[in-house]
Amino acid sequence: MTPSNRGTLARTAMAYVLAGGRGSRLYELTDPRAKPAVYFGGKTRIIDFALSNAINSGIRRIGVATQYKAHSLIRHLQRGWNFMRPERNESFDILPASQRVSETQWYDGTADAVYQNGDIIADYAPEYMVILAGDHVYKMDYELMLQQHVNQNADVTVGVLEVPQREASGFGVMHVDANDRIITFLEKPDDPPGIPGAPHLSLASMGIYVFRTTYLFELLRADAADPHSSHDFGKDIIPTVVRHGKAIAHRFSTSCVRSQDESLAYWRDVGTIDAYWEANIDLTTVTPQLDLFDKDWPIWTYSELTAPAKFVHNEEGRRGHALNSLVSGGCIVSGSYLHKSLLFTGVRVHSYSHLEGAVVQPYVDIGRAARLRNVVVDRGVRIPAGLVVGEDPVLDARRFRRSARGTVLITQPMIDRL
């Protein structure tokens, strides 16, 4: 599928990305950065997917609201997303919490993160607002969602997908009628309702919403004046529209961008160490579920100027090679072996090392004869020579962050304590 050329609706819309979340279930991986700024896929950040979807859909006005530990994210956005040009009626605004409405508070909920920047949005006068979460990995044509919103004369259109019922308690869950009008909406229920006829599945919100701008700000002004509101889209705004307006569900399967090799609608919340590791390692398969080589729907990002990846030494026991792996620019694999692993920019793997199922973030240095299995290594970590991880669960859990499913997170403070 090629990016939208129609632009009729996308050009009248503004994409507003909520990128202030911490992502606490990623533990130490988000200590220095917000979840949307976490590295993914070898050279991108998680937020690049929502932003690329907006660009590829034809949207040319974008705002990004930041809050938690935003420096890494803001620096990435400044370097990689500064190509929008006002003279072409384009804009890209980074919107950190700046107490524009109240002098005593930062963003107090997702709805407040939009409300506080109402004057900036009003200057651009978009007809529609596409509210996006900045911490999910997927490819989607928002133009198609905008079309449904207009065609069904909706007050809000909510992006939805089917998820296993046992996993749905982390989402907004809804019931819809035969025309996909939302009848009930529950935010993160303890016992999520199943889909009629398929009780093992629930219809879950993707955190993607389309509103007509004037109507959205009517809702936001009323919400801001409500002292009992949590100022959250899922908890307050969407349930209000379900009760008093027309809320429509937009099924992700109808607007998911698939390449020829993709058969299923791909969407991931990489919010746990296991989910993050699995989504990255899946990219090393022959036919991954997510196609990053799709030239028709590119994932835009900031790309550092680096030398090509380099593999050196070719002798028995000291042969630099990789199998079923992704190796980014600036990496040097020196007499070591990689299998089903992913190296981000500038990683150095010294001789006699063995990596299996390793997700290694930028500028990591892996010492000689290290053995790493099923690991996530944070940016800039220096792995000492001879370190073995992934072979002794008890030792791994004592020294590092080990998940119940066996993924081991390694950060520099953990190494320093060895």
Curated annotation (Swiss-Prot):
Pfam entry (one): NTP_transferase
GO biological process: one example: glycogen biosynthetic process
Entry annotated with the keyword Nucleotide-binding: yes
EC number assigned by the record: 2.7.7.27
Entry keyword Hydrolase: no
Entry-linked InterPro entries: ADP-Glc_PPase, ADP_Glu_pyroP_CS, GlgC_bac, GlmU/GlgC-like_hexapep, NTP_transferase_dom, Nucleotide-diphossugar_trans, Trimer_LpxA-like_sf
Disulfide bond annotation, renumbered to this chain: none
Binding residues annotated for alpha-D-glucose 1-phosphate, in chain numbering: 107, 172, 187-188, 205
Pathway: Glycan biosynthesis; glycogen biosynthesis
GO MF: ATP binding; glucose-1-phosphate adenylyltransferase activity
Segments forming a coiled coil: none
CDD domains in the record: ADP_Glucose_PP (cd02508), LbH_G1P_AT_C (cd04651)
UniProt-listed SUPFAM superfamilies: Nucleotide-diphospho-sugar transferases, Trimeric LpxA-like enzymes
PROSITE patterns according to UniProt: ADP_GLC_PYROPHOSPH_1, ADP_GLC_PYROPHOSPH_2
PANTHER family: GLUCOSE-1-PHOSPHATE ADENYLYLTRANSFERASE, GLUCOSE-1-PHOSPHATE ADENYLYLTRANSFERASE-RELATED
HAMAP family cross-referenced by the UniProt entry: GlgC (MF_00624)
Function of the molecule: Involved in the biosynthesis of ADP-glucose, a building block required for the elongation reactions to produce glycogen. Catalyzes the reaction between ATP and alpha-D-glucose 1-phosphate (G1P) to produce pyrophosphate and ADP-Glc.
Name of protein: Glucose-1-phosphate adenylyltransferase
Organism the protein comes from: Gemmatimonas aurantiaca (strain DSM 14586 / JCM 11422 / NBRC 100505 / T-27)
